[in-house]
Amino acid sequence: MSRFLNNKLRRYGMRAMLSLVLSALGIAAGSSNEVAADASVKASIETSKGVIELNLYSDKAPLTVANFVNLVERGYYNGLVFHRVIPDFMIQGGCPDGRGTGGPGYTFADEFDSSLKHDAPGILSMANAGPRTNGSQFFITHVPTPWLDGKHTVFGRVTKGQSVVDAIKGNDKINKITLSGDTAGV
């Protein structure tokens, strides 16, 4: 695992443990189908079909958001394509070889929060090949996909541009991804 992710894991490890303990004691807020994203970090995906705006859940999936922010800041996603598009399911991008088999050269663990579900269109989640295989690939849903809960880390939600998500076809381009908000705190 990269030094960047190790530092983030150490930084958020205590927070995650505290959250787990509070949840076990029933002190944390109850779950809801409408989870408010931490609006302090936002992403904007400029595609060949238009712009998709997202809020990221840096408070509930800190390692995943930190990884995504790091890759965006390095320009990793710029020029890649949505290599896997399944109508009435999802669009997937983030593979450097455009075939769904590549990644950034490392993997990291899943982050599951019981309040984050694949319960609506526009859920931003990590694509993976099984437990602990997250890297750079992500997907955005067209419809609710509850069978993915507990298998793929949810780390954001579309706030504007779901029609763009729905218009994306295979090999449509990610021109660039930009961030706004407090990315220094991620």
Predicted regions and their residues:
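Cyclophilin-like peptidyl-prolyl cis-trans isomerases
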Residues: 2-11, 15-186
